[in-house]
């Protein structure tokens, strides 16, 4: 079973003090960075109530005009928390400076635009969990290529989740209603868990393919070495034959 993210989906959609709720002590902002103390009863999109889905869509419509500013703060905080991310964005900006034909999807500015578009598409799939999960994991797997060259690792997703949880859940649009606050906590927890799952799954495939290639290369090298040694033996043997 895949290891669970620190941002557990057990950010309950039930009242924190309800009979089945998860007792949590949040920050004054209405959203805590603290980890869940429970691993069971994971929230899923299917477990969101109709009113919570409505709250997500309504609050997103109100939040969207300010989304660019919100996501910019999230990514800038992530740069501070993870120098690897800052380096990736910096390199992308340098490349983009010399390429005016197309948008470089690795830059900070384009990430902000794509994240806004991503939430538009994601919230449209709340009633189709398979498509919802596939969309998120696809984004996660696309980042696996950064693991080798840029040392991108799973802990970056965790940091992103912590920052996003605090920034989004503390936004006045989200804190207006209890349903919206619960729903966004659940959404972000699932989002980070699936992003990391897609990333780690693709990374395992890369490593498996790399390992297989190394084994095959090793076989070829062994065969070439054996062939070379046989040739040398023949040469040595021929040199020892008496002249007739």
From Swiss-Prot:
Q: What is this protein called?
A: Globin-like protein 9
- What are the residue boundaries of the Globin domain, all occurrences included? 47-200
State a single Gene Ontology molecular function.
Answer: oxygen carrier activity
The segment annotated Disordered runs over 1-38
Question: Pfam families this protein is in?
Answer: Globin
Keywords carried by this UniProt record: Heme, Iron, Metal-binding, Oxygen transport, Transport
**What are the BP-aspect GO terms?**
oxygen transport; response to hypoxia
UniProt-listed InterPro entries:
Globin (IPR000971), Globin-like_OT (IPR050532), Globin-like_sf (IPR009050), Globin/Proto (IPR012292), Mb-like_M (IPR044399)
Where on this chain does heme bind? 111, 143
- Protein origin, superkingdom: Eukaryota
Please give the family membership noted in the entry: Belongs to the globin family.
């Amino acid at each position: 079973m895949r290891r669970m993210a620190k941002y557990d989906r057990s950010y309950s959609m039930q009242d924190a003090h309800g009979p089945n709720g998860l007792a949590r002590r949040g920050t004054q902002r209405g959203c805590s960075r603290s980890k869940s103390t429970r691993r069971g009863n994971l929230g899923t999109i299917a477990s969101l109530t109709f009113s919570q889905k409505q709250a997500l869509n309504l609050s997103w419509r109100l939040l969207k005009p300010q989304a660019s500013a919100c996501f910019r703060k999230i990514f800038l905080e992530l740069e501070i928390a993870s120098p690897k991310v800052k380096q990736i964005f910096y390199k992308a900006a340098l490349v983009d400076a010399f390429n005016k034909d197309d948008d470089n999807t690795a830059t900070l500015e384009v990430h902000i635009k794509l994240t806004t578009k991503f939430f538009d598409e994601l919230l449209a799939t709340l009633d189709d969990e398979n498509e919802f999960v596939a969309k998120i994991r696809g984004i996660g797997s696309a980042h696996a290529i950064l693991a080798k060259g840029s040392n991108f690792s799973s802990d970056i997703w965790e940091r992103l989740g912590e920052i996003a949880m605090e920034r989004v859940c503390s936004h006045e649009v989200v804190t207006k209603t209890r349903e919206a606050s619960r729903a966004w906590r659940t959404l972000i927890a699932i989002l980070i868990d699936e992003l990391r799952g897609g990333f780690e799954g693709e990374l395992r495939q890369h490593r498996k393919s790399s390992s297989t290639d190394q084994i095959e290369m090793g076989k070829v090298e062994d065969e070439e070495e054996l062939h070379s040694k046989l040739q040398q033996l023949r040469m040595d043997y021929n040199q020892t034959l008496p002249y007739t």
